């Protein structure tokens, strides 16, 4: 999606399926196709589903091992001859969702579990909640990611999510929790007053703020 300087969309959202074997080469080829559908951009923000440090993708458990230590930011900047910033996808979704007041936690429910923590609008970098041990030595992702949903079914998945929300409030003392990702559509219980579901477009709209918060 193309955004203006205020973070408002000025184009339709474009989507291309992730390659069946999502190696860096295969994904970059699809990103080239996307770039041609969105002409006229002067800079690029990229949300990546894994650990990112200084534009390098460190680990992507749910994508492909070849993304380990891949210089995605530098590669795209050279490929498209534009300034590029790459960040964790949950972090960028958070930029688009938060109100920049107090302690705000963002959790995305999809193939895996993404998470981002903000204090007064500033990102606390490096949070990887999805892989943190939770119950019986298994991680949040084992229970609340796609494999957990497939294993336990929708009813138990909702019970586990409700329990996780209560536990996370004890851990982070958040003022607000934002839930995003495709599996939020499967939530069937009433959320607490300080928890809300946000649109998947927040992951796109937050791309502008990625440039503001990091200079």
Regions found by a protein language model. Give the residues of each.
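Two-metal-ion RNase H-like nuclease active-site motif
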Residues: 104-109
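Short beta-strand scaffold segments in enzyme catalytic cores
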Residues: 1-3, 50, 95, 113-118, ...
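Glycine-rich phosphate-binding loop plus the immediately following alpha-helix
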Residues: 72-74, 78-90, 123-160
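A short, acidic, amphipathic alpha-helical segment used as a generic capping/interface helix at domain edges
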Residues: 157-170
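Glycine-rich phosphate-binding loops at beta-strand->alpha-helix junctions
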Residues: 168-200
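Short glycine-rich, Thr/Ser-proximal phosphate-binding strand/loop in the N-terminal lobe
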Residues: 1-26, 59, 122-150
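Short glycine-rich anion-binding loops that position phosphate/pyrophosphate groups of nucleotides
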Residues: 49-52, 110-114, 183-184
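Glycine-rich phosphate-binding loop and adjoining helix at the ATP-binding site
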Residues: 12-45, 51-103, 143, 192-208, ...
């Amino acid at each position: 999606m193309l955004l203006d300087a205020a973070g408002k969309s000025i184009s339709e959202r474009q989507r291309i399926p992730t390659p069946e074997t999502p190696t860096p080469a295969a994904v970059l080829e699809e990103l080239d196709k996307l770039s041609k559908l969105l002409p006229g951009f002067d800079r690029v923000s990229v949300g990546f589903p894994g650990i990112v440090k200084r534009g390098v993708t460190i680990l992507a458990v749910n994508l492909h091992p070849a993304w380990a230590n891949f210089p995605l930011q530098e590669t795209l900047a050279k490929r498209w001859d534009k300034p590029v910033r790459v960040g964790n996808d949950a972090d960028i979704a958070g930029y688009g969702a938060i109100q920049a007041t107090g302690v705000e936690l963002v959790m995305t429910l999809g193939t895996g579990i993404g998470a981002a923590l903000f204090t007064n609008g500033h990102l606390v970098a490096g949070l990887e909640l999805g892989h943190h041990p939770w119950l019986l030595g298994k991680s949040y992702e084992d229970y609340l990611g796609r494999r957990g949903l497939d294993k336990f079914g929708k009813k138990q998945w909702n019970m586990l999510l409700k329990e996780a929300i209560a536990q996370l409030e004890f851990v982070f003392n958040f003022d607000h929790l934002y839930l995003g990702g495709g599996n939020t559509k499967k939530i069937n219980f009433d959320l607490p007053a300080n928890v809300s579901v946000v649109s998947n477009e927040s992951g796109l709209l937050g791309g502008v703020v990625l440039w503001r918060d990091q200079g």
